[in-house]
Every structure is written in C-alpha cells, then in structure tokens.
Amino acid sequence: MKSIRELAWSVDEPTYRADSAISYSTLSRFEREGWRKLSSLFDKIETPSLTFGSAVDTKLTDGDEAFNERFIVCDFPPLSDTLISITKFLHKNFHEDHRRLSTIDDAEISKAALMFNYYANSKYENFRIKSIKESCSEYYSLLTLAGDKTVLSQNDYADVKACVDELKTNPATKYFFSSNPFETHIEKVFQLKFRAEFQGIPVRCMFDEIIVDHEKKMIYPIDLKTTGHPEEEFEGSFSQWRYDIQAKLYTYILQECIKNDEYFKDFKIQSYQFIVINRRTVAPIVWVFEGNFGQVDLKDGKGNILRDWRNILNELHYYLRYAGKYSIRAMENNCVLKISNLTPC
C-alpha cells in the first residue's frame, strides 16, 4: 500500500506560502477586487476570524505542539475585531522603532484608524486617537513580546478548544478526526500540499484533510471551515467566499498528481466535503459539494455568476503580464462601452 504522502509536495509552510504558484486565496481575491488592485493582491490578509480559524485548524489537525509553536495565549482586555486589526497593522509597520504604542505619532495612529473606518468622521479625530491609545496599548505590547507567534485571548482560546473538542466527539464529525487500528486500508492525512500546472501556469493547494480508502480506491477531499453564521446557512458563505473555486481547483491539482502514478492512477476522487462549525452555536455540519469536477460557470441563489477558476486564472495571468491601463473588456471594444444595466420599470 502506497501512501498519498508520497505524491505530496514536501515543503514547509513558509516555503509553500512564498511560492509563486497561484492559490485559491489569490484567485478568489482577484475575482472580488479586480485587476486594478493587483499591487496588493499578494499581500497577506490578517483578520480575527481568519486567526481563529487557523487556531482551530492547527490544534485539531497538527496537535498541541504545533499549536504552541504558532500561538501564545494571553489575558488582555477584550477588543473589537476592528481594534485588533488596527493594532496589528500598527505593530506590523512600526514595531521595529516603537516597542510601545504610545510612542507612535498620533497622525500615524489616526491614519491607521481611517484605513479600517474607525470613527472616520473628521470631528472624531482626537477621540479615535485617544481611544486606540487607551484600549490597544496592552495588546500592542503583547504583540511585541510574542515575536513570531500569534496572540490569542483567553476567551478565543476557550472557544478554540470548545470547537476542537466538539469536532472530535460529535457523531457527525468524529470519524474524520479519529483512527481505527482495524481499518488499515483507511489513510487519513492532514495539511498535505500539492503543486501542478494548468496550461503552463503553476497552481498550488494545501488540503486540510484527505481520506484514502485503499480497498475501494477512493479519495475523499475535506476542508474545515469556521463561520460567523449558523452552520445551516453555509451555502451563503460558500458562494460569497467562492469555496467552489477551492473545491474545483484542489480537485484538479490532486487529479493531476495521481493520474500518472502507477498505484493511484485508478483511484477516484469523491465529492468535496466541508466540515463547518460556528464558535457560538458549536453544532458542526458536513456540507457536500458535488460539483468539484465541473468546468463551467455557476449561478448562485441570487443570480450571481460564479466564474470557473480556469477562466479567472487565465484572466489573472494576462493582467500579471500586462502593463496597460485598460481592462480586457475595454480593449476588446476599442474603449467604447455600452451602458446596459438599466431596464424599463
């Protein structure tokens, strides 16, 4: 029996993140923001919700040792997501010269607050500076002490642990995170990375989990999602954050990696499963996406067209090599566009 690990791209996570191959996150962000924001397309995005999801993922699939290497749990006054984001931004840009928040120039603090639309009205300028200095100083200092580790509050850690414990014990999800010594034909692996090409363009992915049934020759791709909405409402998040791109891209890459392998070439990749949990309701649900082999655009319940990742990738590849100031649509129409979004009432 050959392990699926032998086909994986064996690099550490920093190497994976730094690689130039296009990922799901890049494609989905490009589709949301458009080609005029290419200059910031590859910038790392950090939000409290992403941090929480990463913490659950790490503790659940990599274990406590890996969690302790990446995160530090501290007790500090509760902050809103906006204040946390502002503090992280200030720390990222000023920590080398300012170990404390209080030494940063007020104008820079105000500028950072405006970036996150925090009391953006000009009449609140003094208040927003004062509020950030009073509320965020302790958290800023903790970020300095933490170094390369990510700071989690005690409350966040309690929620992380609750989610992990529930996922490991809930009848709907415990199978994914447990092993049966009598099922030697079942292989469960976490955080495997793969790399392939589409029409000469490098693409990459990292699976939260892959389950391989070596007897039935079936491969089950699985992803863990933490959500701010009730688990039953995941379909809205699925289309909003374009998880169809993730499922279809990852399936394509995995298929490319197994198709020429003598052992795995006859294995069949199954529908993509998303394990969804909310930190408040803590009632995990497994959502199944059967369109992961699809190659056509999709339409969501609101009528929005969800372009196939291949079309997005080709467009992104064009703009990454393009130095002009016009869109593809404008160029194709000689810079004459028709207003067509209005209809008679």
What are these regions (language model features)?
Residues D165-Y175, V212-H214, T251-D261:
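Short regulatory "switch" loops immediately downstream of catalytic or recognition motifs
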Residues L192-D244:
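Non-catalytic protein-protein interaction segments used by genome-maintenance enzymes to assemble
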Residues V56, F207, Y250:
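Single, functionally critical "micro-switch" positions that shape active/binding sites
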Residues M1-R204:
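Metal-dependent nuclease catalytic cores that hydrolyze phosphodiester bonds in DNA/RNA
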Residues N68-E69, S80, P230-E231, V282-P284:
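Short catalytic/ligand-binding loop motif for oxyanion handling, primarily in non-cytosolic enzymes
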Residues H98, D105, S239-D244, L249-C345:
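Metal-dependent nuclease catalytic regions and adjoining charged, substrate-binding loops involved
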Residues L60-E65, I211, T226-H229, Q255-K259:
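Hydrophobic/aromatic-lined pockets within catalytic cores
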Residues P181-E183, I211-I219, Q255-K268:
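Secondary-structure boundary elements
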